[in-house]
Amino acid sequence: MIKRALISVYNKEGILEFAKFLEKNHVEIISTGGTYKHLKDNCVRVKEVSQITNFDEILDGRVKTLHPAVHGGILAIRDNKEHMDTIKDKNIEPIDMVIVNLYPFFEKIGKGLSLEEQIEFIDIGGPTMIRAAAKNFKDVVVITDPKDYKRIEEKLEKEDEIDFNNRKTLAGKVFNLMSAYDGAISKFLLEEEYPEYLSLSYKKGKDLRYGENPHQTAAFYTSLTEDGAFKDFEKLNGKELSYNNIKDMDVAWKIVGEFEEIACCALKHNSPCGVAIGDTLLESYKKAYECDPISIFGGIVAFNRKVNKETAKELVKIFLEVIIAPDYDEDALRILKGKKNLRVIKCNTKPLDKMEICKVDVGILVQSTDNALIKDMDVVTAKKPTEEEMENMIFAMKVVKYVKSNAIVVVKDKKAVGIAGGQVNRIWAACQALERGNNSVVLASDAFFPFDDVVKKASEYGIKAIIQPGGSIRDKDSIEECDEKGISMVFTGIRHFKH
């Protein structure tokens, strides 16, 4: 039976209606600070917590509920005679429900606050109360999520009590929230990429229909401590996004984000099948399409500019799963919405991932994101690349790092006409890419050449320039082969393995 409730919330959403429901059901309400004023101003009968503690708020509100009169009422086990005799002796009344949500520490990260200002959003009293209530969940109902108000209200109307399983679930939500909250504070204060204990503060955005395959379950979570592209994207049309859609969108968006020029990326099964730069958006799309007109079918297309009417007309000529771009003009959106299942995504934030996380059995691997920029290009051959070849080399290297190793990309006119990856040896990747991209000019490799066979094969297909990290004990063999065949080659010193 719920007789007394303590309410202290930063987020006032729905609290007035819930408090009025409790009042109607003869529940005594105790409250603090701004919540007390909000309820009182809206004609809810409420006691200020200082009336219970006989102790005023102090230290600018830092100490309000940290008092035995509050925590004794929460933590007392009702069927423990000693506990109940103790609180009776101390004139402490039991508290049966605790409704608390916390200062918005998550929301204030990255908003330009000083250290002192951010620290003021570290909640102390709230976490202490909800942890206490969660520990004693058999006797105390604890609510931290405004979405639960209606459900609990319906439960009380129907049964006049909250059952054990619901109490346990609500308690579990407390510790789930606190692990994320404390993790965010720890990350903020430590400022370490690899702390001794790793806590990830993510919140579920939505359950997904299934994972990579229909027999796998899945959900999508977003970071509570970092902003980024996929925190605020907007779906303007089409079916719900799937697990595979979101994974593919991530890679495609990162690829077009590599370029200042107008760029388009076509992607399938997490691998680019066409990437191009154009003078116009339509040209960039047509060039990307020409890279692999077969694989683009049923894929994802990303742009780094607003989609216009002319480009939209071309896009709807084939079956695509997703289109992602910073924006769409009115005519373009109308055309794309003509395909009711086509997912049209608006995303105007650049990718901001700083770390990558990979799950392995009973552990995770964490590494910094591969954001290395080419700073020095060492021409190691007698022949020097032309300015145009150098531009194509840089373009090719930006693409190849997103292709699963072993990866080879061949390019002509800033168009990735041959992309091959996921091969267990480099020559196989080279053969596939060159076969697809006959008459290309530049070849890029994600890692060094262990032998000179890639150079030999490249020369057969008319490649004029090669860019690769270098670093093989047989680099000399590849350099000599390039010199013999009249090919220029550049070493970057930066490897781009992708597993």
Swiss-Prot record:
The keyword Hydrolase applies. Keywords: Hydrolase, Multifunctional enzyme, Purine biosynthesis, Transferase. One of its GO terms (cellular component) is cytosol. Belongs to the PurH family. Pfam families: AICARFT_IMPCHas, MGS. It comes from the Bacteria. Residues 1-144 form the MGS-like domain. SUPFAM superfamilies: Cytidine deaminase-like, Methylglyoxal synthase-like. Its EC number is 2.1.2.3, 3.5.4.10. It comes from Clostridium tetani (strain Massachusetts / E88). The IMP cyclohydrolase activity resides in the N-terminal region. This is Bifunctional purine biosynthesis protein PurH.
